[in-house]
Structure formats: structure tokens, C-alpha cells
Amino acid sequence: FLGICVGLQWLFEGSTEAEGTKGLGAFSGMCEHFPATYEGADLKSPHVGWNSLEQIRPDSRLLRGVADGAFVYFTHSWRAPVVQETAAVTNYGGAFTAALERENVMGVQFHPEKSANVGLRVLRNFVEL
């Protein structure tokens, strides 16, 4: 299974976007809206544009062949917490889960279909599992 964008968020227990609505609960934690400010500066939401994947887990099958620091395309207002299964983080208003995986349940917050060669690599990795 591969959840993309809000599909990654649904893999968690829920979100502040819809209080009382349960997520699938495949991963622990709640998704939250980006803060209005970060380190004393206003933070725009939604987070739209290119940003880097950091701290890529070496054993990630989904991100195999993707270099730490590779750029992917985001458009989202809610973010998933960093958890044990996080395969990569991105920093925007603090660190959030950009990709996660446990066995055959995976998710990416970014849009691989808009992320050029890096996105194609991620999709190819998933299809070849």
C-alpha cells in the first residue's frame, strides 16, 4: 500500500483537521496543521513547492537510490509527526514525516507524480517491490 499526500496522513490515528474522525491507525500519532509562526517568523500555509528529503533511512525500500537532500514537490497544510517508521523528514516549521514505511505499508507526504526524476524513482521502487 502506498498513501500519497493526504493518503499518508490517513495512515495515522487521526488529524486536527477533522477532530473525532479516526484515521486508519496503521501508525501512531496525530497529524496537525502547520503552525502560524516558526522561530518568530510568519509561516505560510499551505506548504507549496520544492523541499528536500533529509535523514533518509538507509534500509528504506521505497527511497532506495534517492540521495539525502533530494528535492521533491509538496502541497499540503497538515503534517504528520516524526515516528519510528519515518523513512525521511522534511523541515518546514520544524521536522515532519515526508515518507514512512513498515513492511508493505508506505506513505509519502510529497507528490511523486510532480517530483521529476526523484518521484519517478520512488514510484518505480514501489512498483518493483
Where is each model-derived feature located?
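Cysteine-nucleophile active-site neighborhood
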Residues: 1-48
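Amide-donor transfer/coupling interface in amidating biosynthetic enzymes
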Residues: 29-129
